[in-house]
């Protein structure tokens, strides 16, 4: 009986290892081209498996992409956590600029986020995973505000407003008609800094 239990544990570990290979293959493709150009056959080829094998681990392409995006965001979240936990926590502007530049510099992450925001027929499991994604940044900004002395109830409400404001700026001006991508990025960051200064004045009185 004990040997059967060990075998089951081993099989589960092997399954999780293979699942992780699929996720890493997906993220590799996301770094090369927009997520909407990535299909299950592309992922299968990158991972060295058949397309049918992918569905043993993920019920749909949507589920795979969300899981990959969540893992990517979770990795980035560690950098934000270090900014928050410093002896002198990051300013609202520093947080905003880092959040903005991450989305601008990681095209597939941004596209996946906006896709999930706008899609109106997400399945229940996908909705739950997307809630987890958005909660990551809501929680991070709330923690930052609490480090700056804002009470928890206010911090939570303002975190929703702040993250929505920043993503709205990026969505509005990402394809703005300027001569270069760098000028667009500079303009977006200027607007983000203005927004951050308003929140700083309102919440921190600075």
Where are these regions (language model features)?
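Hydrophobic alpha-helical connector segments
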Residues: 67, 81-107, 158-162
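Helix-turn-helix
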Residues: 21, 29-63, 67
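N-terminal intrinsically disordered/low-complexity leader segments
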Residues: 1-17, 203-206
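Amphipathic alpha-helical packing segments from all-alpha helical-bundle domains
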Residues: 74-82, 123-149, 156-160, 186-189, ...
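Hydrophobic/aromatic-rich alpha-helical bundle segments in the mid-to-C-terminal region
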Residues: 115, 146-193, 203-206
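Amphipathic alpha-helical segments used for helix-helix packing
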Residues: 104-124, 171-178
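Generic hydrophobic, amphipathic alpha-helix propensity
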Residues: 15-27, 43, 68-72, 76
């Amino acid at each position: 009986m004990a040997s059967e239990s060990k075998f089951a544990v081993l099989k589960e570990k092997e399954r999780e290892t293979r699942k992780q290979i699929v996720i890493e293959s997906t993220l590799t493709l996301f770094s090369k081209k927009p997520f909407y150009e990535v299909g299950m056959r592309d992922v299968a080829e990158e991972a060295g498996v058949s397309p049918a094998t992918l569905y043993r681990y993920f019920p749909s392409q949507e589920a795979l992409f969300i899981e990959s995006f969540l893992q990517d965001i979770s990795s980035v979240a560690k950098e934000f956590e270090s900014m928050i936990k410093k002896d002198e926590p990051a300013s609202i502007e520093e947080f905003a600029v880092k959040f903005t530049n991450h989305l601008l510099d990681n095209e597939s992450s941004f596209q996946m986020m906006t896709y999930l925001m706008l899609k109106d027929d997400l399945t229940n499991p996908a909705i739950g995973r997307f809630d987890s994604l958005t909660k990551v940044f809501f929680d991070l900004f709330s923690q930052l505000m609490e480090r700056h002395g804002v009470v928890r109830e206010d911090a939570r409400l303002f975190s929703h407003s702040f993250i929505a404001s920043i993503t709205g700026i990026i969505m509005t001006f990402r394809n703005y008609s300027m001569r270069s991508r760098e000028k667009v990025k500079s303009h977006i960051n200027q607007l983000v800094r203005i927004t951050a200064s308003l929140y700083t004045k309102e919440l921190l009185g600075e």
